Amino acid sequence: MRLVLFFLSASLLAQQPVHIRVNASQKLGTFPSNWNLFGYDEPNYTYAPNGRKLIRELSALSSERVQIRAHFLLTTGDGAPAFKWGSTNVYTEDASGKPVYDWTILDRILDTYAQAEVSPLIEIGFMPKALSTHPDPYVPVWKPGDKFDHYYVGWAYPPNNYDKWSELVYQVVKHAVAKYGKAKVEGWNWEVWNEPNGGYWRGTPEEYDKLYDSTAAAVKRALPTTHVGGPATTGPASPRAAAFLKQFLEHCEKSGAPLDFISYHAKGRPDVTDGHVRMGLSKELADTEEGFKIVKSFTKFRNLPIILTEADPEGCAACSARVYPPNAYRNGTLYPAYEAAAYNGMLQLQERH
C-alpha cells in the first residue's frame, strides 16, 4: 500500500504545497524504545503532588523501565525549588570542619522514584557550599529573561578538598545500597557532573578530569558492580565541546579511570522565521553524529554504551514562550512531531556508526 499525503500552508495562494510520501508497505524493522530517560533542573519538584503524578504517568506509559535524571542533588540549601535551582543539603560541616550528612531530602526524591517504579540516573553534582573553592555567592539569581551572569556561582566550582568530596560520593552510594538494596543500585547509572564544558563547571578540563577520577573511584569503592560514566558535555558539533570530549576520553584511556558509559548532550536551536517557529533539528543531529564519531575514534571505548542524557529541541526548560518566542513550539503538535523526527534521525545515525 502506498499513501501520499499533501500538506498545504494556510496561505494556499502564496505558498507551494509540500508533498510527503509514506510507503506503508516498506518495513524497516522494530523501532527500539530508547526514549525512556527524562530529566529536569529542579529536584525538589520530584515529590510535589504534580511531580509525583507525572513520574507515575511516565512509568505507566513506558514499555521500558523509566530513568529520571535531575540536577542539584548534592547542593546546599533548604530544599525550596526555584527557577533552575534546587537543593538537598546532604553535606554540611560542623564548627570543627567535620562532615555532617543529612539524607532527608535526597531520600524523599529517591523514594518517589522507587514508589513509581522508575530508576534514577544519578547526576553527581553539584558542589556543596562547604566544599566549594568559591562558596560565596552560592545560591543563583536568575529568572526568565535574565542573562546567566549570576547563575553559575559557588555550586559550580571544584572542591576545596578532594578527599572530603570523594568520601561524600562514597557515602551517597553506600547509603543508596543500604536503603534500596545492592541488586537495584547495581542497575543505576552514575554520571559525573553536568556540561563541564560550559558554565556548570567553573574549572578547567584538567580539573574536571581530576574530579571524574575522584568521583568514579568513590562510586566503585562503594559498589564495584554499578555503572559510572561521563562527561555529560554538551554540543559536540562545536569545536570547543568536541575538544573537551576528546581530551576526557584521552585521559580515561591513559589513566584507566573507570568508564562504563559515555554521555553527552545534543541540542536543537529553534528560531522565529517569517512569523513562525522553525525548528533546529539539524543542529541536534549534528551534535549526535559528531559525538558518535569522537567515541568511535577510540578503539578502547567504541563499544561502550552512549547515553544522550539530554537530547532536546533547545537548552532551557525554564524559558517559556512568553519571554522566548521560539519556544512556542512546546504549545502544540510541533513538539511531538519534532521529537519523532529527532529520534528517528538519531537511530539512523546509530546504525550508520
Language-model segments: which ranges?
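Non-catalytic accessory regions flanking glycosidase/transglycosidase catalytic cores in CAZymes
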Residues: 14-189, 205-235, 254-258, 297-303, ...
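Catalytic-core region of carbohydrate-active enzymes that cleave or remodel glycosidic bonds
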Residues: 275-353
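Substrate-binding cleft/loops of secretory-pathway carbohydrate-active enzymes
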Residues: 233-263, 307, 311-334
